[in-house]
A protein has these predicted regions:
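Domain-edge interaction signal
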Residues: 1-140
Length: 140
């Protein structure tokens, strides 16, 4: 069993705070990409709001802003199910990774009305991420 690194832990803690649910390491099996899409868009939206989850660069993808570096990180998380479970069960360690980020994440969640769209969160964050990316890179 290999331990999670700093960026993996920060991503997992931010995911739970942003979406109100835990990252699912099995979501990508059988070609389902929703967990990765949600996390890609969440990290991009947080970065645009001044909350840096990792040092990721984004470019346009057919599903909106995409970071190859973040995909590598997410795939490494997917292979560490036991470590992910252990991290989520350790409230003290989770809190350490959210220090100074909670209020910013909560404020963004509220502004983006994440709770209203939990049933369609993948599509909602895709739309929000895409609009944000286009408004910052394409439109004057």
């Amino acid at each position: 069993m290999s331990a999670l690194n700093f960026d993996q832990k920060k991503t997992l803690a931010a995911f739970e705070r942003f979406f109100g649910s835990r990252y699912n390491t099995h979501a990508e099996e059988n070609g389902n990409t929703s967990m990765h899409v949600e996390t890609q868009k969440m990290c991009y939206l947080l970065k645009m709001a001044g909350v840096e989850i990792g040092d990721f660069n984004y470019s346009w993808n057919f599903r909106g802003p995409f970071s190859p570096g973040l995909l590598v990180l997410l795939r490494s998380i997917d292979r560490k199910e036991a470590d992910v479970t252990e991290f989520y069960e350790n409230a003290e360690e989770k809190e350490k990774f959210l220090l100074g980020l909670k209020s910013k994440i909560d404020e963004l969640r509220e502004k983006l009305e994440i709770d209203k769209h939990l049933n369609q969160k993948e599509q909602w964050v895709e739309i929000l991420g895409s609009l944000t990316y286009i408004s910052r890179t394409v439109l004057p």
